[in-house]
Structures are given as C-alpha cells and as structure tokens.
Design a protein with these regions (language model features):
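Gly/Ser-rich catalytic serine loop of serine hydrolases
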Residues: 50-53, 115-120, 171-188, 277-288, ...
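Conserved active-site neighborhood of the chymotrypsin/trypsin-like protease fold
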Residues: 58-142, 299, 303-309, 314, ...
C-alpha cells in the first residue's frame, strides 16, 4: 500500500516545475530634494510592492500562461516571474478580474519545462489530502505544506484591495498552511492536479481592534479549479470577464433609518433586509418595468437579496441575455418583474459598500 507521504512526494514532482513566484513592482518616489531632482531625476524608483505565487497552466507556441491572484498584481506597472529553476523573467498581464481575484500573465515559454493540469473541483471530498506551497513567496519557494479538504463549498464575503465588498465567493476550505506568498499558487490533490488557486486565509474572527477577536489557525481558502478555468479562459480570450448588469444604483437597506424605511420607502416593518434602488439608468433593462427610485429589491433569480454582496452573487450567477425574476417592494407592495440581463457597462466590477452601480 502506497503511503500518503509517498503520494504527496509524487504529486509534488508532477507540479514543482510549474509553480512560480510572482513579484509586482510599482513606482515610488523618494521625496528627497537632491541634485538628481534638479536635473530631471525625480527620485522615483520601482519598488517591489507585492509578492505571491502562480502556476503555469498552458504553453502556446512561444508563450506560456500563468494564473495568479488579481490582488498580487493589482496596481503594478511591472511584473516578474521567478521560475522553479531560479531564473527570473518578465511577465505581462493578459487580463485580471477583481471579483474572482484572478489574473493571467504571459511569459516567454523557452524556459518553461513543466505545465500544470487542472483537476475537477466538483469531484473533491472533505477529508481528502490537499497540498500547497511557497508559504512566504520566493524566500521559501518550492516548499510544500500538507492538509485536508475541510469544506467543499464555503461561502465567504469578499473585498478588494480597498476593502470594498465585491460580493460573496464559494471556495474550498483547507487546513493546508496558507500564508502570505501562497496567494495565487495551486492547491493540489495527490494526483498532482490543481484543484484550486489559493487566495486567502482567515487569521482571526471579529474586528482586529475588538477584545472579542479570536486568533484562528488552519483556515485557508482556494478558488475552485472549475471556476478558475472558466474565468481564465475568458481573460485570455477577452482580457476581461463579461458579466451581466441591471443598470441601477443601489444602497444597502441597512444604511436606511427606521423612520425613512417607513415614511420614504413605505416598507412593511417585516422587511429588514434588501437593497434600495436609488437610480435607474436610461439604458437599464429595468426601464421596461415599474421598478423605480426607492423600491427595495429582496430577491433575484430565486435567491434572497439581503444586501449588495448577495445581490452581486445572485446576479453574477447568470449570463448576459438571461431572463431573471426580480421580487421587490414598490410603494409597500411586494411585486415581481422578469428582466433580461444586459452587459455590464464598466470593467471594474467593484463599488462602495454603501452606494453601488449594478
């Protein structure tokens, strides 16, 4: 009988050469008043601002493609990839997506000796062995951590680099050590297949300034490989992810006072969650309904809408052109409308938690 350790070692060898470190640089200014400033050198320089991992998943002619996290390369004006051989190469961004926190880079394929393969994340089971690596980026590159699949479909709230809510994500939970530097790297099974892309870890519960905050260990999260494949294919083909939109501006009902809920929205007291329509754009598909300012959306496509995060999750579960049923309160009355979803008018896919365009 082959031990788990032996299987893990074989799996590591299958993917070792495809795992890379990703380093992002941005311009910084020294702010000093020097002779160089007087002669045209402002003192700006490229500084490494972020480091994570990535995995080479495809070679096409002279080009190799790397998947990593969007937050690793976001805002960078230069990206470099450190191969398992120790060679550092320039990378360019093919496309990135803040909602899924995924990005695709391309590099010269001449130095690429190994490419990873994706497994089917729908087929994983709780308790199965999971492997991750590069816990602190390039300093500990090509190292390996081992754990299990703790949960297949864990729903968590997601924010971008500015702390803005971008919705909710269904992720794989694992106790394989996930640390700074793991971001963007692969979570693999014992067959050496990528079953997820490591994205984040939960280090504490509650507010960091709260006395009730509790330190947490062994809770890492990875984006399921089936979702990864869908997203990166779109990024390579279009440079972005195409998502549907409603063409409206919204605010969480949580931000509305009890008095305004009753007097302005005419909302029944039993309705305690939802999103308030603040504006319907001229090109919005909702123009064909009577949904208007101060209406409260409580359901989309059969899924409860408790706030902006859950609305985005429900909305992004559909495609452009889909017709969905929206349930909403209009002047205190619960109504329904069928709406055909249109193309999102911007590529940012992010907005403030208190006021959002969707």
């Amino acid at each position: 009988k082959v031990s788990v350790g032996t299987q893990a070692s074989k799996a590591f060898k299958k993917i070792k050469g495809a795992v890379v470190s990703v380093e992002a640089y941005s311009n910084s200014s020294s702010g000093s008043d020097t002779l160089e400033d007087l002669f045209g050198d402002s003192g700006s320089s490229e500084t490494s601002t972020s480091e994570g991992s990535g995995v080479i998943y495809k070679k096409d002619g002279n080009t190799a493609f790397v998947v990593t996290n969007n937050h690793v390369i976001s805002g960078a004006n230069k990206v470099e990839v450190l191969l398992s051989s120790g060679k550092k190469v320039k990378a360019s961004v093919v496309g990135h997506d803040s909602v899924s926190d995924l990005a695709v880079l391309k590099i010269d394929a001449s130095n690429v000796k190994q490419v990873a393969t994706f497994g089917n994340s729908d087929n994983i089971n709780v308790g199965e062995t999971a492997l991750a690596g590069s816990p602190l980026g390039s300093e500990y590159a090509t190292s390996l951590t081992q754990g299990i699949i703790s949960a297949k479909k864990r729903t968590i709230d997601v924010t971008d680099s500015n702390g803005t809510s971008t919705g909710q994500a269904t992720v794989i939970q694992t106790d394989a050590a996930i640390n700074p530097g793991n971001s963007g790297g692969p979570l693999i099974n014992l067959a050496g297949q990528v079953i997820g892309i490591n994205s984040m870890k939960l280090s504490s519960t509650g507010s960091s300034t709260s006395s009730s905050s509790t330190s947490v260990e062994g809770m890492g999260f990875a984006i399921p490989s089936n979702e990864v494949v869908s997203i990166i294919n779109q990024l390579v083909q279009n440079g972005k992810v195409v998502r549907p939109a409603l063409g409206i501006s919204l605010v969480d009902l949580d931000y509305v006072s009890e008095a305004d809920r009753s007097q302005t929205l005419n909302l029944p007291s039993k309705v305690t969650s939802g999103v308030v329509v603040m504006k319907v754009n001229s090109s919005s598909p909702l123009k064909k309904t009577d949904i208007s300012k101060y209406d409260v959306i409580v359901s989309l496509g059969g899924k409860k809408v408790s706030g902006l995060s859950s609305l985005r999750t429900a909305l992004y579960g559909h495609k452009v052109g889909d017709t969905v049923e929206i349930q909403y309160y209009h002047k205190g009355e619960l109504k329904k409308a069928n709406v055909k979803l249109t193309l999102e008018s911007n590529d940012k896919n992010t907005s403030t938690a208190s006021n959002s365009g969707n």
